[in-house]
A protein has these predicted regions:
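Residue-level marker of positions within ordered structural domains that often coincide
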Residues: 39, 87, 128, 259, ...
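Non-catalytic regulatory/linker segments of enzymes
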Residues: 18-21, 38-42, 75
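Short, conserved, surface-exposed binding loops centered on an aromatic residue
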Residues: 194-195, 244
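Conserved nucleotide-sensing/catalytic segment adjacent to the nucleotide-binding pocket
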Residues: 1-16, 24, 30, 50-110, ...
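Short, flexible coil/linker segments at domain boundaries that flank nucleotide/cofactor-interacting
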Residues: 26-27, 197
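Glycine-rich phosphate-binding P-loop
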Residues: 30-51, 188, 199-223
Length: 316
């Protein structure tokens, strides 16, 4: 049996809709576009292909519409991608593009992004407000952060990960993805599927603004410097932040193991780096406790309102 990993390339975020598909197709030469407006039909076809190709290592692109739908598959060792036509922005770059049209049953209902744009825009507005409140929360913790201590943590981690690692090649390949996002099914993620085969797991803990993403960004920069390929999983609230890195050449992953993507793994070998304990004055939550509670409450309210709007798509 081949290995399957699942991830998202689209997200409903505090900065609106994002599309990370291009970096995942950059190394792919042959792209098959499935033309059919019904995502259930497309999913059924892709699942049939998955069954037929169960000996291959396959990347499965999850749909942001439902946890039961998939938007495409990539068989990287064959340089082949099969994806829903609606996701692909025409940019051939010399690629071999084929189109497969599945006849549409006129009596069937199908989902159209354009038909539901008002709903998405309403949800994005709530997520944007949530991100703004989250930024305020970050400032509280940043005000009590010791950046010298943070730099020391980073220095030690880089030494641990890259000691004796030689430059691999001139240019690293960077795959930009999401391990989860806000959907009509609620907040979803595929973290366990992605990290299960990774030998060295590093979980980064902390509070908002305590440098979790910054730590991973420094690791990312080192990988790029050394020509090491990286899977970069962006934050679905703020896509400018990083929630996870997977460095398969080193058999290492770094994961922001805080809500809403906390995972419980009973593995004593997991390394924990707690940026709050390591770098922040522990009096901050006593000094600003009431303000923190208010901001957390407002943040959760906005996110829940946004999710409620997305969930209304299930009844349409």
């Amino acid at each position: 049996m081949g290995k399957q990993i699942r991830y998202y390339v689209h997200g409903h975020t505090g900065k609106g809709f994002i599309d990370l598909l291009p970096s995942n197709l950059e190394q792919i030469n042959q792209i098959v576009l499935i033309e059919n407006k019904n995502k259930k039909v497309v999913t059924a076809l892709l699942e049939t292909i998955l069954t037929l190709l169960n000996e291959e290592d396959i990347e499965i692109i999850q749909s942001t519409l439902s946890k039961d739908l998939i938007d495409g598959i990539i068989i990287r060792n064959k340089s082949l991608a099969i994806i829903h036509e609606s996701l692909y922005q025409a940019n051939d770059n010399g690629k071999n593009i084929q189109r497969v049209t599945i006849p549409v049953d006129e009596d069937e209902d199908y989902f159209s992004l354009k038909d539901h744009q008002k709903i998405y825009d309403e949800a994005y507005n709530y997520f944007k407000k949530g991100l703004s409140i989250h930024d305020q929360l970050e400032k509280v913790y940043i005000s009590k952060m010791d950046f010298n201590k943070a730099n020391k943590v980073i220095e030690q981690l880089l030494q641990q990960l890259f000691k004796d690692v030689e430059k691999k090649k001139e240019k690293a390949i960077l795959y930009e993805r999401l391990f989860g996002t806000n959907t009509p099914d609620g907040i979803v993620n595929t973290v366990l599927n992605l990290i299960e085969p990774i030998e060295k797991k590093i979980f980064i803990l902390g509070r908002a603004g305590t440098g979790k993403s910054y730590v991973m960004n420094q690791v990312l920069n080192k990988c790029i410097e050394l020509g090491i390929d990286v899977e970069l999983y962006r934050c679905s609230l703020d896509p400018n932040s990083i929630d996870m890195l997977i460095i398969r050449e080193l058999n290492v992953c770094l994961h922001d193991n805080t809500a809403p993507h906390t995972i419980a793994v009973n593995d004593p070998s997991i390394q924990i780096i707690d940026m709050y304990k390591e770098t922040v004055d522990q009096q901050v939550e006593k000094e600003y406790g009431e303000r923190i509670k208010i901001l957390q409450k407002k943040y959760k309210e906005q996110m829940q309102l946004g999710l409620k709007v997305l969930k209304s798509l299930n009844s349409n």
